[in-house]
């Protein structure tokens, strides 16, 4: 337990929250451990008075798998996956894809002139935080893996439609599979992939949301939140998910899988 920094959609909310959490460090059985964290959260909820609420489940892994199948250059796939959690910047990236501003002939021609000029410069010279050598490598990648102007609009449409998917949890697999089939994306999701398939647990309605899980950068798989209504107020009382890279990102030389959750106090 202790204080944690959390961004909020409501500007009136404090970014510092007192929380009590629980986690499985060194998670070996992903699906069962994910389910265990949600089950523990639901058991803890029994001690709280509320009239109704919702359990929303998402999965970052599904988004990243879908992005990996889209017909866009590798650098764009990495960019979209990396910035999924930064909603405003992510939307800016989609706009660039949709309008093809990054492949505008005038801008490309200017870039080519800069490229030819930089070829004559010191490769170790630093420009805007990057060495000339790094900048030249990035430009070479663009030349070898160009993005067709006609593809951007269609890819953006697919991503936006995917992020709109929200349904009762027992329909999650069928909704996703219909979407993948419609857009000719080579992916299939089994309903057992999700930690729960019951649409109602106690007083909670259970949903799948494709866009949920963008609040924190470190989530890598299953994510969830529990919102309750108490005294006519909607309260986000619990949230959590899987973070298989966080411990190594913090300096561990060994990859340690983990999943956890926290209650707001």
Regions found by a protein language model. Name each.
Residues 46, 64-73:
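Charged, amphipathic alpha-helical linkers/stalks
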Residues 55-58, 77, 190, 209:
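Residue-level detector of family-conserved "landmark" positions at structurally sensitive sites
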Residues 1-50, 102-265:
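Positively charged, Gly/Ser-enriched RNA/tRNA-binding surfaces
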Residues 51-52, 74:
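A short alpha->loop->secondary-structure connector
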Residues 1-7, 54-65, 83:
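Short, glycine/charge-rich beta-strand/loop segments that flank catalytic centers
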Residues 71-103, 228-230:
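Acidic, His- and aromatic-enriched active-site or binding-groove loops in soluble protein domains
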Residues 50-51, 90:
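Intrinsically disordered or highly flexible coil/loop and linker segments, enriched in small
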């Amino acid at each position: 337990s202790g204080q944690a920094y959390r961004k909020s959609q409501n500007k009136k909310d404090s970014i510092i929250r007192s929380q009590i959490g629980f986690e499985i460090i060194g998670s070996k059985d992903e699906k069962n451990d994910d389910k265990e964290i949600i089950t523990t959260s639901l058991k803890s909820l029994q001690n709280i008075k509320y009239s109704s609420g919702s359990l929303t489940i998402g999965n970052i892994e599904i988004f990243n798998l879908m992005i990996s199948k889209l017909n866009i250059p590798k650098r764009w796939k990495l960019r979209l996956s990396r910035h999924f959690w930064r909603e405003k910047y992510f939307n800016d990236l989609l706009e660039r894809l949709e309008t093809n501003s990054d492949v505008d002939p005038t801008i490309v021609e200017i870039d080519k002139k800069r490229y030819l000029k930089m070829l004559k410069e010191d490769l170790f010279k630093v420009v805007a935080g990057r060495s000339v050598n790094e900048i030249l490598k990035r430009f070479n990648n663009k030349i070898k893996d160009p993005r067709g102007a006609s593809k951007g609009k269609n890819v953006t449409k697919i991503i936006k439609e995917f992020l709109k998917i929200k349904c009762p949890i027992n329909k999650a697999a069928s909704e996703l599979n219909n979407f993948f089939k419609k857009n000719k994306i080579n992916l299939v999701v089994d309903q057992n992939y999700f930690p729960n398939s019951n649409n109602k647990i106690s007083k909670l309605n259970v949903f799948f949301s494709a866009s949920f899980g963008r609040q924190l950068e470190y989530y890598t798989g299953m994510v969830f939140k529990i919102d309750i209504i108490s005294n006519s107020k909607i309260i986000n009382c619990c949230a959590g998910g899987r973070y298989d890279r966080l411990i190594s990102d913090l300096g561990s030389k060994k990859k340690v899988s983990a999943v956890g959750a926290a209650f707001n106090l």
